[in-house]
Amino acid sequence: MNILIFGPPGSGKSTHSRTITERYGLTYISSGDMIRAEIEKGSELGKELKKYLAKGELIPDIVVNTLVISRLRRDRNNFIIDGYPRTAEQVLALENYLYDHGIRIDVAMEIFISKEESVERISGRRICPKCGAVYHLRYRPPKVPGKCDLCGSQLIQREDDRSEIVAKRYDLYVKNMEPIIKFYKKQGIYVRVDGHGSINEVWERIRPLLDYIHNREKKRKENE
């Protein structure tokens, strides 16, 4: 089973991607994780990528395409790709690669939330720069305001978590995804899931669909 999953900032797609990965034994491929790993290396590329994120702008297509497709060369089937493709150029690069290698996508799933919900979820997030613990001012506040429960360090807000940056990222997401959604609708594999509510509530909207696809693909392979 091969899945594309996408959604606006704060939609919970990465959280659900990891649950899906574990439940169905898939390989998790995240463009965001690969970009952040490059930034953490402190490489010249990482420094350039950090500038784009700080301004709420998309990473250049050629960079993201190279990162994702190089990963796909190692894991050609049973994968979930989180947050890619996000532009028409990325769709073209991915589709060309899949066609050349006889790979098909079973479902392109969008977890959708409103702009207001997106801004609230992301802008309230606080990170511990020392141990990496994540908090939220509303949903998971620290015991002592501004301090990490685990190590006592001062919590910070990432630059790209500021409300004005989140709003910009949301608008950019909606604009860029419109033609991509149309493309996957034409292929008959696009599904939109309501991302409002708790993690468990959203998961119960996702699980029946993926169970069905998983069982369908299992039977298809048995009959080959």
Curated annotation (Swiss-Prot):
UniProt main location, coarse: cytoplasm
NCBIfam families the record matches: adk, PRK00279.2-5
Gene that specifies this protein: adk
Binding site for AMP: S31, R36, E57, L58, I59, G83, Y84, P85, R86, Q90, R158, R169
Region called LID, residue ranges: 124-161
GO CC entries: cytoplasm
EC number(s) given by UniProt: 2.7.4.3
Keyword Protein transport attached: no
Enzymatic reactions: AMP + ATP = 2 ADP
Segments for region (NMP): 30-59
Domain notes: Consists of three domains, a large central CORE domain and two small peripheral domains, NMPbind and LID, which undergo movements during catalysis. The LID domain closes over the site of phosphoryl transfer upon ATP binding. Assembling and dissambling the active center during each catalytic cycle provides an effective means to prevent ATP hydrolysis. Some bacteria have evolved a zinc-coordinating structure that stabilizes the LID domain.
Subunit and interaction comment: Monomer.
UniProt keyword list: ATP-binding, Cytoplasm, Kinase, Metal-binding, Nucleotide biosynthesis, Nucleotide-binding, Transferase, Zinc
Listed SUPFAM superfamilies: P-loop containing nucleoside triphosphate hydrolases (SSF52540)
Recorded metabolic or biological pathway in which this protein acts: Purine metabolism; AMP biosynthesis via salvage pathway; AMP from ADP: step 1/1
Tagged with keyword Transmembrane: no
Family annotation (InterPro entries): Adenyl_kin_sub, Adenylat/UMP-CMP_kin, Adenylat_kinase_CS, Adenylate_kinase_lid-dom, P-loop_NTPase
Organism: Thermococcus onnurineus (strain NA1)
UniProt record, GO biological process: AMP salvage
Name the record gives this protein: Adenylate kinase
Protein's job: Catalyzes the reversible transfer of the terminal phosphate group between ATP and AMP. Plays an important role in cellular energy homeostasis and in adenine nucleotide metabolism.
GO molecular function, one term: adenylate kinase activity
Subcellular location: Cytoplasm
